[in-house]
Amino acid sequence: GISAVAQMSYYDKEQKDKYLAEAVRQFLQFADRMFIPEKGLYRHGWVESSSDHPAFCWARANGWAMLTACELLDVLPEDYPQRAKVMDYFRAHVRGVTALQSGEGLWHQLLDRNDSYLETSATAIYVYCLAHAINKGWIDAIAYGPVTHLGWHAVAGKINAEGQVEGTCVGTGMAFDPAFYYYRPVNVYAAHGYGPVLWAGAEMIRLLKNQYPQMNDSAVQYYQVKQKTTAPIFAIDTEEKKD
């Protein structure tokens, strides 16, 4: 895949330029076909022989796309000619995905369909990517830190007493109807959830070493410097005023 090709640039210095060019070419061709600009999301599949393509925005597929962009940006030199274009796709995708986070912190199996179930593995991938992007300075901690924090809190709540990750969709191919995605089973033995949860946890540790989240009333606010007080900037006065 694209990530593997990009990573090869680390190990074969003589062929580094070739591998980077191929990884970027694949990413941009993928995005050109799969990214839906008006949604800020990736479709799950694309059929070359069809004029109309399925537009089901499966959560974990969007996770893999976001993770691929992260891994590509990690290895592309700052002055690489097409780095800015890859970054533009990444940031547009971040905006599209974060706008659809549920109030519980998880994301839905079909991202833009709130009646589809909440899914753990995709959420863990997003948490990793968002935390990583904040740590790298690609996106703003003030805007995206609280979303990331909420996502991690939700993911952590899906780890049961046996250390199993609950709520992970099993392997899923492309489909042409929504019911297929709605009724895909979840299973604690679906391995897709474990790696992302470990990655997300490790990146959150790094994030919390670099940023200083603080409760402000009932909202999480992210600060780049440690605050002198733990008292909220504002709070709701719940006491009744007496005449």
Where are these regions (language model features)?
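Well-ordered alpha-helical scaffold segments within catalytic/enzyme domains
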Residues: 2-15, 64-82, 125-139, 196-211
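Flexible, glycine- and charge-enriched loops at secondary-structure boundaries
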Residues: 16, 20, 83, 87, ...
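Loop-centered beta-sheet repeat module
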Residues: 17-70
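Long, well-ordered core segments of solenoidal/helical folds
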Residues: 20-43, 87-105, 147-164, 221-234
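Conserved catalytic-core motifs characterized by acidic clusters
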Residues: 40-48, 109, 171-177
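Solvent-exposed loop and edge beta-strand segments that line ligand/cofactor-binding
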Residues: 48-67, 78, 82, 86, ...
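CBM-like carbohydrate-recognition segments
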Residues: 113, 117-118, 124-242
